[in-house]
UniProtKB/Swiss-Prot annotation:
Short name of any one Pfam family annotated for the protein: 3A
Subunit record text: Oligomerizes to form tubule structures through host plasmodesma. Interacts with host A.thaliana At4g26020 protein, which is involved in antra- and inter-cellular trafficking.
Composition-biased stretches (Polar residues): 60-72
Name used for this protein in its record: Movement protein
């Protein structure tokens, strides 16, 4: 008997937290309107609670009635004080990809080319994905490089003359970083090896064919969403990297890797922050205990 009353209390509390709302349709002229009558609760608060229990960030917008599409040539709209974007949750789980390592190889006296397909794993049930940022870092691996470099973001589905979406130019004399900011999302059906966006690299460095003259590392940020997104701007930022900047110890490198924690649980992030702190302390100790072991080279005893 006690268990019976407990179940009644638990069910009533669930109804208070997530009350049922009856949705009705009515036709007003050529339009079909969706009515969500308010019960003894606030619709926005219910929606907010439902979103707060999900992972990801919430995009709220209170601009008024939203178009839901058409049904049998009639326009369907929703008579709510919030629009569809209020229901869109951007899933940021595992959204930063790991660094991919590749090589840029020579082509003899001809310009060297390389194509990288940006084809992320679709590890979400949501129907749209936005690759909001692509970072590509190119570092020369030979002495005295002098090649000019061009990196272009290509949409292979456009006409030949319109395929270049963004482009940046520089030199491989020093390490260089290109950051592409994208402003559109793609449906799941388009995320294929044939249809995905590509990075095209072109360098006029003269080097033996099929022998590497530079290292290419790249990564991207992806965000999944239920509705398609279209941001305002797209751009390419070029960042030359000073040769004097280098990691002095393995501990420092490990600390840098942990600056952006992976995962969402508190336990995961706390563990990674503890490792970050430990590696930074170890790096400082190593730097303080460094002895000068440089080998002196001279031409006094030439043979």
């Amino acid at each position: 008997m006690n268990s019976f009353f407990k179940s009644l209390r638990s069910s009533s509390s669930r109804e208070l937290d997530h009350p049922r709302v009856t949705t009705t349709l009515s036709k007003q002229g050529a339009d079909i309107v969706v009515h969500n009558p308010s019960a003894n609760h606030n619709n926005k608060e219910v929606l907010q609670r439902a979103m707060d229990s999900s992972k990801g960030k919430i995009l709220m917008n209170n601009t008024g009635t939203s178009s839901l599409g058409t049904y049998e040539s009639d326009q369907i709209s929703e008579s709510e004080s919030y629009d569809l974007s209020a229901r869109m949750i951007v899933d940021t789980n595992h959204h930063i990809s790991s660094w991919k390592n590749d090589l840029f190889v020579g082509n003899g006296d001809k310009a060297a080319t390389k194509i990288i397909k940006i084809h992320p794993t679709w590890d979400s049930r949501k129907q749209y994905m936005m690759i909001s940022r692509i970072v590509i870092w190119i570092c020369p691996t030979i002495a005295d490089p002098d090649g000019k470099l061009a990196v272009a973001l290509i949409d292979p589905n456009k006409s030949v003359n319109a395929r270049t979406v963004l482009k940046g130019q520089g030199s491989i004399k020093d390490p260089i970083c290109f950051v592409f900011y994208l402003n559109w999302s793609i449906p799941k059906v388009n995320n294929t090896s044939e249809n995905c966006v590509q990075l095209h690299l072109l360098c006029d460095q003269v080097y033996k064919k099929d022998v590497s003259f530079a290292s290419v590392m790249y990564s991207w940020t992806k965000e999944f969403c239920d509705s398609p997104r279209a941001d305002l701007d797209k751009s390419c930022m070029i960042i030359p990297i000073n040769r004097a900047i280098r990691a002095k110890s393995q501990a420092f490198i490990e600390a840098c890797k942990l600056i952006i924690p992976k995962g969402n649980s508190e336990k995961q992030i706390r563990r990674q922050l503890a490792e970050l702190s430990a590696n930074l302390e170890k790096s400082v100790e190593e730097e303080e205990n460094v002895t000068d072991n440089k080998i002196e080279i001279s031409f006094d005893n030439e043979i």
